[in-house]
Regions:
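Beta-sheet repeat architectures centered on beta-propellers
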Residues: 1-248
Length: 248
């Protein structure tokens, strides 16, 4: 009734996890269906945006091309062409704030859609052409509504009665750009993905095992949290935490 979409993930050992998905502002999910297609069963939702109802297909998180990893926006338009600072065809998002995402480029937003188009502060895609990236001959960009991904671990089961402080959060990621970690969603530290050997291009999607050092307060539950606050790709394969133990 509240328009929030629910999803369930079931592991091979019958473990079950639930998640909820909220869309932009006062928009509401109305219904959901699984539609057989050539390569996979597509997830299609009916969503009310303002006075209109749209059918939207959720993008696969196993895209064939790396450029399509950046389809991390809702109700999106896919642009393919020369580097540009103006994107049109967005009349369905007039009056909304959108983001523009592309490989090797920082995400641009929030940007107000007016007259069915949006303009970025600079040309998207010009940076990697200036760097001589021969793999990039055409810009592929996505323009749409951003969403935030949040994950929080359960209480540390061991020694429940002792005080715990989270000192380090470790996670394994696949095709990830940008992430924050901490003792909770109010105290997060960014994953510093760039190194001194990097070019000036925006960091690309990485497959890595990462450790983020945090300064957690003493608490009884010993939880940890992750957040992806920008519309950038991330697949989390595993999460762990390091705790200091103390007496109550």
């Amino acid at each position: 009734e509240d328009g929030v979409l629910l999803s369930m993930t079931r592991g091979a050992n019958s473990q079950v996890a639930w998640a909820q998905h909220e869309t932009d502002g006062s928009d509401r999910f109305l219904s959901i269906a699984s539609v057989p297609s050539t390569d996979e069963d597509a997830v299609v939702v009916a969503v009310r945006r303002g006075a209109s109802v749209y059918l939207e297909r959720m993008s696969s998180r196993q895209p064939q091309l790396e450029v399509d990893l950046y389809s991390c926006v809702e109700s999106a338009l896919r642009y393919e062409g020369a580097p540009t600072d103006t994107f049109t065809g967005l009349s369905h998002l007039n009056g909304r704030y959108v983001w523009v995402t592309a490989r090797n480029s920082p995400p641009y937003g929030p940007l107000l859609v007016s007259g069915g188009q949006v303009t970025t502060p600079e040309e998207v895609g010009a940076n990697y052409q200036a760097a001589g990236d021969e793999d990039e001959t055409t810009l592929v960009a996505y323009i749409g509504l951003a969403y935030v991904g949040e994950l929080e671990l359960l209480d540390a089961a061991r020694q429940r009665l002792e005080q715990k402080a989270v000192t380090r959060v470790g996670f394994e990621v696949d095709s990830a750009v940008g992430l924050e970690a901490g003792q909770d969603l109010e105290h997060l530290v960014p994953w510093r993905q760039r190194t001194v050997a990097d070019s000036y291009l925006y960091p690309g999607a990485a497959n890595d095992v990462v450790q983020v050092y945090v300064k957690g307060a003493w608490r009884q539950h010993g939880r940890a949290a992750l957040r992806q606050s920008k519309p950038l790709p991330v697949t989390i394969l595993g999460v762990t935490r390091e705790l200091e133990m103390g007496e109550m």
